[in-house]
Amino acid sequence: MKNKSQRVVIQEEPFGNVVQNPFNRGSWSASWVQHPEVYGAGPAVVAYRRMITLEADTTVRIHVSADERYELFLDGERMGRGSERGDRHGWFFETYDLSLSAGPHVLVARVFWIGADSISAHAQITVRPAFLLAAEGDLAALWNTGAAPWEAKRLGGYEFVSPDMAWGTSAKTVLRGADYDWGHECGAGDSWQVVRSIAPAYSAARTCMGPNNWMLRPAMLPAMLEEPRWTGMARHVQVIDTEDTSDLAVQSVDHCADEVPSWDQLLSGGTSLTIPANTKRRVIVDLGNYYCAYPVVTLSRGKAATMRIRWAESLYEPKQPGNWQRSKGNRDEIEGKSFIGTGDTFIHDGESNRRYEPFWWEAGRYVEIVVSTGNEPLIIENFHLLEAHYPYVFSGKYEVPSQELTDLVPLATRVLEMCSHETYMDCPYYEQLMYVGDTRLEVLTTYALTDDDRLPRKAILLYDESRGPMGLTQARYPSRVPQLIPPFSLYWVGMVHDFALWRDDTAFVRARMPGVRAVLDAFAQRVNDVGLLEAVQGWNFVDWVPHWDAGMPADADFGISGIINWHFIYTLRMAAELEDGFGEPEFAARDRRLADRMAAAVTVAFWDSQRGVYADDLAHQHFSEHAQCFAILAGDRQTRLDAPDLSRATIYFSHYLFEAARLVGRIDLLFERLDLWSYLKRMGFKTAVESPEPSRSDCHAWGAHPLYHTFATLLGIRPAGFGFQSVRIEPQLGPMEWGRGTIPHPRGSLSLALKRTEGRFSGIIELPLGVSGTFLNGAQTQKLYPGKNTLGLSGN
């Protein structure tokens, strides 16, 4: 029998069928364990091992978790990583099914613990360093931590340093091969010590006297994609005399062109590369695309040689006087620019075929390799990437005559992949945090591309569980550094509404409604006697408009903002639809009463009759597209989107501009704003940016939303009600005369092929079984039925 291991996702508590009294309910037969000399005073890497001998071929299911993160090895082969990111009240464990042959085996977990300090990941919650493994069935006594004789050893060679500019992402790894415990993955070496039990293990079934440690729950997501990539090309090879290269501009006169073929061979997985003794080399590698990946290098000889691998999204242009933020210019260009990045360093021990890699992945398009050798040449046997992100399988696709929309697909899908891991992320290079405002747009794009909604569910659930005493969600979660952006709580209500439309899970939506009401109540408390919402305490961010203060429009911080008032009204109306749709008409009536009262007050206070638009502030000194968008989304139709001198929506908020444009028949505005994304292609971007140039981040998935709008706005495919049990197709093709598309649906897939000739639509629409709908073209409608439908509507 050959050993096999498989990660599985389970839905239920694995030990929930054990009959226990209320004081012990949820207890596991395993305990959390710890190295006897590692208490959490500083970063540590600890290996845990359990050596066993099986008398017969065996299958067993095990559940594994750690604080902070683990890698799990079976007989020296890595079988998984974890624990999936969550918080202490919902600490995830992974489940593995093992098929083992008779004979000796060794399980080893390598557990990293950085701690809650300035170099730690903001998104990584921690209690204290610990490891847990629980087996089901008869092998529990043989394998469970706290019961079986597990051993541990602290691994040498690791140093964790600041991520520098990539703040909030996690410490970077310095690994000294001479001090490293090679072979520990196989259980080899000495200095193993008996572990100590530090806490009983409990699940969320615990009902009384709950723990102050980790409340266990099953992992919600599958294993992340990890696939090897041999990619990239050496754009610049340089002889250097210092390892401090941050201000060393790339100059073609310094380029060692004759060394490029050898580096390119290494990068493609072809041959090894030897760096001579007493040499310093700097190589800038263009990966050709944006990657999130573990860099993996195998080294031989070259005792005490150093290999530093840093990552950057782009190189930087020279500093400009009086401007603290450096520009990047065309992302394809490197000449005259500086490489300012972050990454990991490996110091080789001189032995053969040593494999080095960091404990967390890196991100970017460009890699700077700096190699420094001593008295012995260094052989780089292999250099590759282990690409890492959520394992999407995209089935949504479209074809349109617009080159801009065609070019958008690789950029938008790539940025979504790069910002999707164990949570969604705002950006993989900097904070790696799941922000509500970003996530709503990422999730909508996900709905259009795949029927896999596990990551959207996790996001909605974790935000719900992040709510504090005020009732508002955290702006970003999980995060050990709390942050409150009140408008983001309103977007979370929008996420629940979106899920209710695009997916079909009544129980999940109903479970979120108490949280929806809590958010609305927190805002309602700030509505004054006139009916206007006064600023809610927190960072009232709306958009990265360049002349706004920290993304806040006029009076958003301490006064009364027209934009945020309309945003609240828009959210109240979505909440009322949810309440009606899920059986609570009384709550729906309450939400509508408040929305109507506020809309009347906001119209009086902010409508500017001379300009024919809503003001951002009570003094009518500031005007924006943002106020008009939220007014339209809240039901107002007297305003307009094309008034002169409005503060313009950036790449993020343009989603709401496109939503509003759809409602008022101004689809021309969507096509006009596509130049934001065309600019990205012209300037060498592989992913969408965070904000107007000079942008901090080159990879922000809130900029993927035009992909969603191609399906939902231009091709016009939208749910006609909750559960997507019927569909409303109302295409607004703008200057395009045809379009084809397929999107996933809870009951299968939905596809269409449309052609417009002199205002008349023809084509085919195919709906899943059990799904009906309506096709609209102006005032004309055609009923749609399950299966194939042939169109024939005339119109404008």
PLM region descriptions:
Residues 496, 569-572, 576-579:
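Non-transmembrane amphipathic alpha-helical segments
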Residues 130, 142-147, 151, 366, ...:
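Active-site acid/base region of carbohydrate-active enzymes
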Residues 284-287, 357-358, 423-436, 477-489, ...:
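Solvent-exposed loop and edge beta-strand segments that line ligand/cofactor-binding
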Residues 108-109, 117-120, 140-144, 455-456, ...:
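Acidic/polar loop patches that form or flank catalytic/metal-binding clefts of enzymes
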Residues 96, 294-313, 367-372, 436-466, ...:
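Alpha-helical support elements that line or immediately flank enzyme active sites
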Residues 301-320, 324, 353-357, 375-378, ...:
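Acidic, mature catalytic/reactive cores of soluble proteins
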Residues 166-167, 174-179, 593, 668-796:
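Non-catalytic C-terminal accessory modules of carbohydrate-active enzymes
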Residues 1-426, 438, 454-455, 474-478, ...:
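Extracellular/oxidizing-compartment recognition motifs
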